[in-house]
Amino acid sequence: MTAPSLITPTIAACLAISGGVHVVIYLLNATLPLHVVGLGGSKTQVGLLFATSTTVSMILRPLVGGWVDRFGARRVMLPGVAVLLATLLLLPLAAGPAAYVALMAGLGCGNGVLATAAGVLVAQASPAARRGEALSVYFLATALSFAAGPPLGLAVYARAGIQSCFAVAAGLGAVIALLILILKAPALGTAPSQGFRWFNRRALPAAATVVCVNIGYSSIYAFLPLYALASGLEGSLGWFYVLFAICIITGRLTLRGLSDRIGRARVIVPAVTLTTLSYLVLARPPQVPALAAAAIMLGAGVAMFYPTLLALVVDRTPEAERGSAMGTLSGSFDLGSVLGSLLVGFTVERVSFAAGFYTAAIGALAGLTLFVVTERRVAVLRRSTLGV
């Protein structure tokens, strides 16, 4: 029997849409802070660039999933790409740091709407027997965008300035809009109106797991370089992030269908275990061998955890609610990053860098515990339903 095709035209378009959106976001994330500082902006304003876009995206993602259930992906994407294009066209007209901070809300809106809707459509359009593989490939596009966006933005900025960065971003936005216009997707969703619901209750246990596991994610960017500097480690840590990204990309390429074959839980538990161990290693005074081991473990854990958990949620959610469930899980990823940056930052400031990474490890361990307990309850419920 021939295996069902994985990369259909619809899924290919979703990969291109999500990849394009993330290239735009990462390109601007790498260059706007430099431009804002050059205009005399403060560090607080630089921080607000990211806080504004992340907060807007986090609020929208759970809602977007429900809208896709009700209206269909394409009808949800169209206003999202309109906001994105309008924002990209307004960026060259911004007069100062405060204007750029305000416009980041538009980028957060575009990212939250388009990336979430594209992910829901991938889950809807992929064969059930290869859903884990399809979602791993989808999130591979995000990892590749992270590898491409910042270098592209910095290269253009160095050679031609911020206005050229805006032009490149607007060009990519136009391509994204064209892809959405020709996207073949159901015109309407299947879910009836259920009133305003910001989150899906079925997805809450998985969402709580994501929040816990993601508590330490921002710390590897915010505090690891400072920890290395304070510990006397010489040289740039750029290699750490390159190795980390390579492990994510390699993991999603080589292990993309693993959970379809052996089961979701058998992939999720080792993935979160590796994540926990990586933070414990990072809590030690930074040395090159330990940092390399941590990058490999964390990259492998990140590669497999979220796509597999998302596939598990989709497996267990009625078709009419899958968009809402996926949106809830997607929003929890941003929530974990926001809460984690505050919690780990407070711990680092009041105690030490090591304590901050131990906090990240405790969060990941709490997520692992929550997942295992939830899975046991699901197993008990299934046995009782079957009368076993």
Model-flagged regions — what are they?
Residues 72, 93-95, 263, 284-286:
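Helix-breaking motifs and short loop linkers at transmembrane-helix boundaries and internal kinks
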Residues 105-140:
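Cytoplasmic helix-loop-helix junction between adjacent transmembrane helices
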Residues 54-62, 146-147, 248-249, 253, ...:
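Residue-level signature of mid-helix packing/kink "hotspots" within the transmembrane helices
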Residues 170-189, 370-375:
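C-terminal membrane-cytosol helix-exit motif in multi-pass small-molecule transporters
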